[in-house]
Structure formats: structure tokens, C-alpha cells
Regions:
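Extended intrinsically disordered, low-complexity coil regions enriched in Ser, Thr, Gly, Ala
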Residues: 23-36, 53, 95-104, 138-153
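Non-transmembrane, membrane-adjacent beta-strand/coil modules in membrane-associated proteins
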Residues: 17-19, 75, 89-145
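Structural motif
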Residues: 10, 82, 88-89
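Low-complexity, intrinsically disordered extramembrane tails and loops of integral membrane proteins
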Residues: 1-7, 153, 157-160
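Short, surface-exposed charged micro-motifs
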Residues: 3, 80-82
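Alpha-helical transmembrane spans
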Residues: 16-80
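Cytosolic juxtamembrane N-terminal segments of multi-pass membrane proteins
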Residues: 1-19
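Cytosolic juxtamembrane helix at the C-terminal end of the final transmembrane segment
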Residues: 74-80, 87, 147-151
């Protein structure tokens, strides 16, 4: 099954879902990093030990870690990259299912597409790279080399 779709001047690259147990562990730790420090702070206050500055630092640090783990879990579940082509520019955006990353915009002039191998050599996987000579869009979705070549051929044949 291909990991890409070309429609309406957009290429959508989809992430293969990671195994269920890995996603379950990621979601559990993301949830735990948000709730356990807060629950510990509430328990400390309820037991009469008061609120210490360390609790606030702990909640802050673990909330950042929890947010990062949630983002990784969402990427491994719903992740896709959207590359929108227009006459003058190319807009790249990573979609996490519940949120989206900041858009990266490059000029659509003297564009070259190529695949960069990634991972183990025997896996024969890589990532798609778009380069206009000044700026680069480097996709994060690992795809089989054959599918990347198909995406490159489709993008070169379509005049956006």
C-alpha cells in the first residue's frame, strides 16, 4: 500500500503506524508525565506539607516532557506530511492529527527532487528532499525507495 497520495496539487506522505504496544507505552508515559507531578503536588498540599518551588519546577519539566511524548505518539499514530504546490511557492506542513507544525515555504523555481537513504541499508528506505538551490525541504516520513521514486516522477510530470 503506498504511503503517498497526490491530489489537488498536494502530496500527502503518511507515516506507517508503529506497533500498538509502542504507541500504548508512549501514550501512557505522556499521560503519566502530565498527571503524576500534579497529583503529587495536590497530595502534598492536602497532607499539609505545603507548596514548594520544586513542585512548580517538576510540573513544568514533566509537562514539557509529556508534551513531547504526546507529540511523538501522535506522529506515530496519525502523522502525515502535506506538500502543497503552487506556481510560485511550495508549502510544507507536518500534521500530527491533533495539531500541525509551522509551515515551511520555499520558492518553486529550479526545483530538484531526490531521495536520501536513511536507516539500515538492507531496509532500502529513504526520505524525500526538495531543493531549489537556496532552501531545502527535508521530509521526515521514511518510505521505501521505490515509492519515493514514484513520488518524484509524479511531481516532475505534473506542472504545478
Amino acid at each position: 500500500m503506498p504511503q503517498f497520495v497526490l491530489e489537488n496539487n498536494q502530496v500527502k506522505l503518511s507515516v506507517r503506524k508503529s506497533p500498538f504496544i509502542i504507541r500504548l507505552v508512549l501514550y501512557f508515559f505522556a499521560f503519566a508525565f502530565f498527571t503524576f507531578p500534579t497529583a503529587g503536588t495536590i497530595a502534598s498540599i492536602a497532607l499539609g506539607e505545603g507548596l514548594h518551588f520544586g513542585f512548580i519546577i517538576g510540573i513544568g519539566i514533566f509537562s514539557l516532557l509529556g508534551f513531547y511524548l504526546l507529540r511523538v505518539a501522535l506522529w506515530n499514530t496519525y502523522g502525515e506530511e502535506i506538500i502543497a504546490f503552487s506556481k510560485n511557492e511550495i508549502v510544507y506542513e507536518a500534521n500530527y492529527g491533533w495539531s500541525r507544525d509551522a509551515k515551511k515555504i520555499i520558492k518553486n523555481e529550479s526545483l530538484t527532487y531526490f531521495a536520501s537513504p536513511i536507516g539500515y541499508e538492507e531496509d532500502n528506505e529513504g526520505i524525500l528532499i526538495l531543493d531549489n538551490g537556496k532552501e531545502i525541504i527535508e521530509c521526515a516520513v521514511k518510505m521505501p525507495q521505490q515509492q519515493i521514486e514514484e513520488v518524484i516522477m509524479l511531481c516532475k510530470n505534473n506542472k504545478f
